[in-house]
């Protein structure tokens, strides 16, 4: 009788332990993204985030990806994460602005001088600092900040553009972004909101004459077939994030958080590697068919940056001036700091 009772008790203990372990092994983080396989974000999820989390956790955690807006896109993904429908999501830093201003600093025009500077400063301190604020204030934590397409570059179908004065009178396609609209206007062109899907035909027909789009996307859309003059001014960095709902993040154990951050770091490195290759391939193809790909001198760049001061003034209150100043000074952009301070933007 005693042996039978002991065996039953032992079986119960084993059963409880087994099901507890099984439950622990089934921590699945559902991810919503606009990224797709064959592009840097989708490929980095597939090649780095998923396997890195599985390896770090020994199979106790996994990512369930839903690519190409199959569940949601950017802001909507963030809302679904808040509702507990998904855990992880990707977004541009600009669209994160619907949840709070913590990442607005990444979208300031000319905040970064180069892709290398953007990665270095983000990796060393800026991303961690701003993401901590996001976790505290906005209901989300960004696990990785990275580029998706690098910088926007000017392309037009009419003539060489080397300084802002060369844009005068040209009809320049813009998105609905007030920052982009202001930049184009301050540079002297006529801002013309125009749908992305119609941009190729718009440039071809002359309805619009120029555009300001990240170079690999110009290549994807084959805009270099109808716009032959390019100006490498940079300016607007295409910041993106991998984020998680704060409540779900805080519910993870310390060990689970460690596993997740290990995987997010691997994802950040991979997406940066893939993005750099995507940018280079796109720009190489554009340069091969362009009539001119012009790189302005530093004196000319100061004129392009001057056109961004109004956007910085409009953005006051969404970023910490001392933090922005530190970012600029770490890149040797003392002249731009002086321009911004003189205008009262810093």
In which residue ranges do the predicted regions lie?
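Sec/Tat signal peptide C-region and signal peptidase I cleavage site
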Residues: 18-25
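Bacterial N-terminal signal peptides that target proteins for export
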Residues: 2-14
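N-terminal secretory/targeting leader peptides
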Residues: 26-118, 126, 133-346
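Absolute protein N-terminus
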Residues: 1, 25-26
